[in-house]
Amino acid sequence: MSEMLLQTRALTKQYGRHRAVDQVSMHIKKGAIYGFIGRNGAGKTTTLRMISGLASPTAGEIELFGCRGRDLSRIRSRVGCLIEGPGLYGSMSARDNLKMKCMLLGVYKRGYEEELLDIVGLGGVGKKPVKRYSLGMKQRLGIALALVGEPDLLVLDEPINGLDPQGIAEVRDTVLKLNRERNMTILISSHILEELSKIATDYGIIHNGTLLQELTNEELMEKCSERLEVTLDDPERAVPVMDRLGIKRYQVADREHIYIFERLEESAALNMAFAKAGIPVRGISVTNEELETYFLKLTGGGVNA
């Protein structure tokens, strides 16, 4: 069983009468890329701020690297974060921005800035002032700043928001490189499930401050994969029939639907087997679901802002 690097228990944040985060209990394994999905205003940033120590919970608990309570302030030195945009000095170069952060944290050493710039793909930027960077370059420099001190957990708040396709790809490649080459655990938020599905190993879906679901990438792909959708009155009666046919990959979705993820071409034979068992089938079809459609269905539809 994988080691849990971060857990929250009933984490809550209240602003006056508004509950921005409502009893969120999330679980992040060591070495994971955890995609934190939700619309704008769902509570993502507030949750990340509490985890990073930038805001205090109204209630609930955070456990980080096995520590909680008063020990959190000490252990948060192992957390790097980029929340609500990087704080950059536009007239300075990338190297000088990094040098200032290194000296502030007392981790300055010769060649360290160049090493960090190489990690995020900015090794060749030279002395160009940061104000002349593209938004994608600024985001990658923000990630480099978050890496100062060599954290074990990297927290990124909407790092691809507003980027063009090239910028998104560059940030995505940087995240994958950090995870694969340095075994860094990464908590990354976004409102774009399609993009996070290209890198995430696990997901938490938040809506109106409530964590609706946690699932692995494999579980998400299965939910959205091509399947045979069978509509009938009593799905539980159909289970023995599928067992006799040797069908193993199926899900009783609700009181009227079964999803079958194998032997999709045998729908006619399956329909006949159900009929022989006295189970009337009201509908049977091959279907699949787009990732964004699944997200919108889970959060009640509407436009994903």
Question: Model features per residue range: what roles?
Answer:
Residues 76, 98-99, 114-117, 169, ...:
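Generic structural signal for individual residues within well-ordered alpha-helical segments
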Residues 1-12, 301-305:
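ABC-family P-loop ATPase nucleotide-binding domain
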Residues 9-11, 24, 250, 284:
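Generic beta-strand hydrophobic packing signal
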Residues 30, 106, 124, 234, ...:
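Non-catalytic surface loops within mature trypsin-like serine protease
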Residues 4-6, 13-188, 193-207, 211-213:
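ABC transporter nucleotide-binding domains
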Residues 226-298, 305:
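Short, charged/small-residue-rich alpha-helical element at the C-terminal edge
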Residues 172-261:
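ABC transporter nucleotide-binding domain
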